[in-house]
């Protein structure tokens, strides 16, 4: 998968996860989660710009941003609550939509990291 296609796939997952937060309402989400999501959104915007403009740092940005989002989402959503920030998917009443949105974002982050890593490898002569 090309870096552009991987970025588009990741962006879909990122937006779906964000829409899930909007659907659930920000009153149920801790401030630390909102702050982390805001930082992630800024990084994703920079990444998107780098990829669309075919900037030479786009592959590195894909690995870094994809990896950071992957670690952040796993820590906040999948690891049992250990303190703020946490928005654990295992909580009672978690809906299928939330699982789906997070799952698509996580798969997109893995695809993004792999595409960035692949783009960093030298092409055979």
Language model features with spans:
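Alpha-helical transmembrane segments
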Residues: 2-16
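Alpha-helical transmembrane segments in multipass membrane proteins, preferentially the mid-helix core
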Residues: 42-53, 113-117
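Transmembrane alpha-helix entry/boundary detector in multi-pass membrane proteins
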Residues: 17-43
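C-terminal TM-helix exit segments that contain a strictly Trp-centered aromatic cap at the helix terminus
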Residues: 12-24, 67-83
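Membrane-water interface at the C-terminal end of transmembrane alpha helices
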Residues: 1-2, 100-125
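Loop-to-transmembrane helix junctions at the membrane interface
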Residues: 49-74
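Interfacial non-cytosolic loop connecting adjacent transmembrane helices
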Residues: 24-32, 75-100
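Membrane-interface loop-to-helix entry segments
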Residues: 33-40, 96-110
